[in-house]
Amino acid sequence: MSPLISAASVLAAGLAVGLASIGPGIGQGTAAGQAVEGIARQPEAEGKIRGTLLLSLAFMEALTIYGLVVALALLFANPFVS
């Protein structure tokens, strides 16, 4: 394996995980903050807000997991190496 391809694969794997984590991290922080604010304003809707929050957090976390899968594919099943 060429050292250039190996170095580029490691760099791309790091970028994949890093960039895939930025958006969901910001979104999860915003969603959790808004959920806490909503529960503080309307305590009787806590169950519905919490359920919606957990579902949306799971969908946001899936985006980070996709980035991790791409990174693992680049590191261990590199398609650029013959």
From Swiss-Prot:
Membrane topology (UniProt): Multi-pass membrane protein
Protein name in UniProt: ATP synthase subunit c, chloroplastic
Lineage, highest ranks first: Eukaryota, Viridiplantae, Streptophyta, Chlorokybophyceae, Chlorokybales
Record-annotated membrane-spanning stretches: 7-27, 57-77
First and last residue of the signal peptide: none
Gene: atpH
Function, in words: F(1)F(0) ATP synthase produces ATP from ADP in the presence of a proton or sodium gradient. F-type ATPases consist of two structural domains, F(1) containing the extramembraneous catalytic core and F(0) containing the membrane proton channel, linked together by a central stalk and a peripheral stalk. During catalysis, ATP synthesis in the catalytic domain of F(1) is coupled via a rotary mechanism of the central stalk subunits to proton translocation.
Family recorded in the similarity comment: Belongs to the ATPase C chain family.
UniProt superkingdom: Eukaryota
Keywords assigned by UniProt, alphabetized: ATP synthesis, CF(0), Chloroplast, Hydrogen ion transport, Ion transport, Lipid-binding, Membrane, Plastid, Thylakoid, Transmembrane, Transmembrane helix, Transport
